[in-house]
Amino acid sequence: MASSMLSNAAVATTAASRSAGAQASMVAPFTGLKSVSAFPVTRKSSNDLSTVPSNGGKVQCMQVWPPLGKKKFETLSYLPPLSEESLLKEVQYLLNNGWVPCLEFEPTHGFVYREHGNTPGYYDGRYWTMWKLPMFGCTDPSQVVAELEEAKKAYPEAFIRIIGFDNVRQVQCVSFIAYKPASYDA
């Protein structure tokens, strides 16, 4: 029993001397940093509201989506209707990403609705009718806009959207409403 106590004490003193040597060679943390109290700092009291931070009054706030009376459709639905120029830019964006443009229309509902239960299910308002075939090989946004105009003439009371489809990953990457019927007032 005495031998076990001796060996434990010897191990403890050897370990202590090793750790002391290791600590001596290490740099102490925060060496050379000065205390905060060394720098004079003037702080305003939390009750002083005489000056408010400002960026010079050049803030232009965007109006948020009104919660009542308007339905949100898809991407870009919170913006005003797209002009032809901005529509061409959006189509060019999806073409630049290598996505295949496709037009779809919905004659009655341009939004997700509840038909088969209390919560919108997978089929409730998510499937639209495809306008012709996807435009594989399309390189010019004006071709897509021409098809959009043709779809508007054929179905003037339908919602029409443009989809960007990635045929490699086989996913829909972008979808936005390109036309809302004149009878839709919200």
From Swiss-Prot:
UniProt keyword annotations, A-Z: Calvin cycle, Carbon dioxide fixation, Chloroplast, Photorespiration, Photosynthesis, Plastid, Transit peptide
Family: Belongs to the RuBisCO small chain family.
GO MF annotation, one: ribulose-bisphosphate carboxylase activity
Presence of keyword Chloroplast: yes
Subcellular location: Plastid, Chloroplast
Induction: No expression of this mRNA was seen in leaves.
GO cellular component, one term: chloroplast
Gene Ontology biological process terms, A to Z: photorespiration; reductive pentose-phosphate cycle
Self-association and partners: Heterohexadecamer of 8 large and 8 small subunits.
Role played: RuBisCO catalyzes two reactions: the carboxylation of D-ribulose 1,5-bisphosphate, the primary event in carbon dioxide fixation, as well as the oxidative fragmentation of the pentose substrate. Both reactions occur simultaneously and in competition at the same active site. Although the small subunit is not catalytic it is essential for maximal activity.
Entries under Gene3D superfamilies matching the protein: Ribulose bisphosphate carboxylase, small subunit
Transit peptide: 1-60
Other remarks on this protein: The basic functional RuBisCO is composed of a large chain homodimer in a 'head-to-tail' conformation. In form I RuBisCO this homodimer is arranged in a barrel-like tetramer with the small subunits forming a tetrameric 'cap' on each end of the 'barrel'.
Keyword check for Lipid biosynthesis: no
Protein name according to UniProt: Ribulose bisphosphate carboxylase small subunit, chloroplastic 6
InterPro entries assigned: RuBisCO_ssu, RuBisCO_ssu_dom, RuBisCO_ssu_N, RuBisCO_ssu_sf
CDD domains: RuBisCO_small (cd03527)
Pfam families per the UniProt record, alphabetical: RbcS, RuBisCO_small
